[in-house]
């Protein structure tokens, strides 16, 4: 009897998996890569942070910038982003820390003492017209300094201002960069240097202490670079739009508007871990890791005592390639799923979105070296035996922030909920850094072998006989991430480098991000599902209402790169109307209410008015494709598949060379080739559904359908030039076959799409 094979569409959910490898070369190579990534995250921490105001009372900030030395001047040539009338600075505040190379008494002075008050810690050292006071500074200590400048009705644009000091040897000089350090802008709950900060005199209106004045966070600001200095200034649309600068708004009461570990100021000025993705440098896009695993291969063997294992049994293994897709399940947690018409406005409703991070891995369905025998027959597995599982995997981070010292806990699940093993990663399975869009181990290195439940490989991952048979039948495993431990790297203001905080844990931060953001999942690029979280208002939480309103249109632009050429919202040339929207029930009710208030009948026309709220769940998918319950593309409309195959570069009796869109390639299981005679009788060349994979991708990106691959390695033989050669494409949604009891495995029952049909004399 022929072995029954079932072609399963690739289905996968996001997860993370543990590593266990003794490959020292792999470890050493990864450590070098990790150290390089971490060391790249540097910027200067030297100097003072300055705020320049157009009014006398520190209420109208025009520029926020840092100066590396005691030369705190801003020439008018660097103020082109500010309206001319606001370039006359009447007040300024500088803050930071000062340190000395030798203990001594110092006297401070400026180029405008008559307009200056200055403190070192709590001691006043300059008070406008009065004489400066000496202060003793000790080597090795950091002293907080604050300078206030006020000058009514200045006559020149910009500001010419220098800070000097004089030691006991009466040597006066502009304070150098080695002696100045930027302030540490911690959240107000911090109990570090904030305790000994001076409260003398007016302060910058900055309630959340993120470094951005409150008025700018509310009204809008932008960041530009002039002569190697970052300038944060109020948003002026008629100036900044022409330069292509980005307008930011953020909460004046949240140090991090998106609730991630990076302040709004750190994000927009670049004082941040350089491994954070570009889109998450926006204060309203959350920076956080999403860690999955890609399983590349699975090896199954009989679980035997090594001391009694004979030579023959050592070769009785099953090795299969696997594939993993990252998915988000739309479901109600009662095994039911609802997809209802959303009032014909361009959306649909799912009963719920799964929040679990898991991955379903599809095992290759092609013929094994053992021929037609079952897996159990190949391995000599009997009902009383158990089988060992060895998986080859890689970690991958599809989020927007790096995670350090990664230690996950993962369950391997068969079927719906048969847990084969739950494995907690140990220190020797740790990945030092997993940056966004990076793999561990990297693709040029061997994958990790996962084959044991403990540190000493004494407890293998096993399956009983019935579980083994189920795995062969379904050819699927699910990997659930129960939890993941990993550290955060933050900017160190003392040395300008990123430092991994070993006391931090992403698992403590992620719940706060999830509670205060809207989640959007989008599959626009290569049909890969990408999740992003955007800061959004929670009307029932007073603090969260201080965030700027966020529209669905703006969220798509800042998180996914949508743009508006000719006023139409597009993604990589595709109009927004080519995508559909899917909401969970709570989100759909919110959207429905907003549409009613707007008197709108089509969501696409009011995307700039639909406001996001925290905890919304929105899935946006390419309309051309069909999806399974995990939102993986498994098919497409027939017209779409045909259109994708219309560009045949050349054809012959050896095969077809085509130029096929990579999105279409992802949904194809393969092709069926047949010869049709003049009376309409058809003979399938590859008439087994495990022989559909007769195509290959060439280095130039073109697809070749090889007629010889399952035709005894010979070109097609066409006895009559008027006979037709028909080629059909088969999508993944049409390859779940239930063979008949007599073992029939023909392709007769497969739904197929005709993509090529020519007579023999036409193909040469």
Swiss-Prot record:
Residue ranges, annotated region (Alpha-clamp): 231-239
Membrane-crossing segments per the record: 331-342, 345-354
Outcome recorded upon mutating residue 543 to A: Decrease in heptamerization capability
Effect of residue 603 to A: Loss of toxicity due to defective oligomerization
Effect the entry attributes to changing residue 456 to A: Loss of capability to undergo conformational changes that lead to pore formation and translocation
PROSITE patterns linked to this entry: PA14
Assigned GO CC terms: extracellular region; host cell cytosol; host cell endosome membrane; host cell plasma membrane; membrane
Start and end residues of each stretch annotated as Domain 3, heptamerization: 517-624
Site residues, Essential for binding to cell receptor: 712
Resulting phenotype, residue 718 to A: Decrease in toxicity due to decrease in cell binding
Region (Domain 4, binding to the receptor): 625-764
Effect of residue 719 to A: No effect on toxicity
Reported effect, residue 393 to C: Loss of capability to undergo conformational changes that lead to pore formation and translocation
MF terms in GO: identical protein binding; metal ion binding; toxin activity
Effect of residue 207 to A: Abolished interaction with LF
Ranges for region Domain 1, calcium-binding: 30-287
Effect upon mutating residue 600 to V: In strain: BA1024, V770-NP1-R, Carbosap and Ferrara
Keyword line: Calcium, Cleavage on pair of basic residues, Host cell membrane, Host endosome, Host membrane, Membrane, Metal-binding, Plasmid, Secreted, Signal, Toxin, Transmembrane, Transmembrane beta strand, Virulence
Domain PA14: 43-179
Site note Cleavage, residues: 196-197, 343-344
Coiled-coil segments: none
Region (Domain 2, membrane insertion and heptamerization): 288-516
Pfam families: Binary_toxB, Binary_toxB_2, Binary_toxB_3, PA14, PA_Ig-like
Chain intervals for the UniProt region annotation (Disordered): 176-214, 302-333
Residues given in the record as Ca(2+) 1 binding sites: 206, 208, 210, 212, 217
Name listed for the protein in its UniProt record: Protective antigen
Organism: Bacillus anthracis
